[in-house]
Amino acid sequence: MNPSLHNFRESLLQRLLDFLWRQWSALGVAGHARSDDPWMIDPEALLLFSTHIARHDSRLFDEILDWLHTNGSWINLQRLGTLHKEERLGDSAILAAIADLLSRESAHLKWKLLMRRVEKPESPTAELVHRLFPSIPILKEPDPVFLKHGLERGSIELRGMSQSPRPDQPATFLFKLRALFGMQARAEVMAWLLANEQGHPAEIARQTGYFRGSIQNVLNDLTASGHIGSIRIGREKTFSILRHDEWRFLLTWPNANAFPQWINWAPLFHAIQTFLDTLGKPGLDQKSENFQAIQLREALDQVTPALARAGRVHQMQATRDLRGTALIAALLSDLESLIP
């Protein structure tokens, strides 16, 4: 038997919560921000992942709600819904409840469209109502908005302490580009090209969470500006930023040597979420190591395409050829390295 799987999952969950605190604090959530990470944050992927993880920290969850109350207009709702569906990332009920809550404010009416897109058609029965925060009992009347979506939690009291994303750090680079280029795909395309210098439409579409046709149209429009060039290599047309260094005026933080890294966060978060769910299956600790390895191998098979999209599949020690203890040890080591 391998009862350490439970302890490993608890340790992994705490690392993920620390990571989420770090990322959300960099975006403006009240907390201790550490803004020296070299990558830009993907707010849609981060929010979706948080619906799955932040329910294990009620303070973090409510600080995210507070941030959305102030900054919800910076979330690309169409992209959020697409990533949720295509990457199977995040909790639908929690996402619908958040959207419902925000849509009751005049500044966030558009969130109602997201709520309708992700909510379940039928109302939850009493048997299908679940506690939002597993470790916190409900002592007073539950919040009616979350209860409507089958989630029981206490009343919500937002502190109003969240700030808008600061433009002088790598973490918020995508927000800076959205302020310059708008809330549609153009900002993501520019962010990706600045980080990677060149790419073709299919690759950029996979990395940014948009359809290829949309990306192709954006690239064609950007090319007309004279700042983006293209060249045909084989069957693919590759696009790049001309005079790349001239865009360094966007690097407005101290000691900025390079543009922030673009990480394809959504499939990476999906993979971590899947492994965490597998480790949390009831009774898994009490099963034989062979049974545990079979469960983990099934999870590995399931997320291998996502790991490939995230550019991590070749860094994995765990493979289908491993068995028993060897597979478990390799996969747990991989999970440690997947969390930045």
Which residues does each PLM region occupy?
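Long, low-complexity, charge-rich intrinsically disordered regions
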Residues: 1-168, 252-340
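Short alpha-helical segments that sit at the start of domains
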Residues: 160-188
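Short, cationic-aromatic polyanion-contact patches
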Residues: 175-186, 200, 232-255
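Short amphipathic alpha-helical elements of helix-turn-helix/winged-helix folds
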Residues: 188-196
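Short acidic, hydrophobic short linear motifs in intrinsically disordered regions
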Residues: 197-208
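Catalytic or ion-translocation cores adjacent to nucleophile or general acid/base/metal-coordination motifs
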Residues: 204, 217, 226, 242-245, ...
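Short amphipathic alpha-helical interaction segments
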Residues: 209-224
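A short, conserved structural fragment
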Residues: 223-234
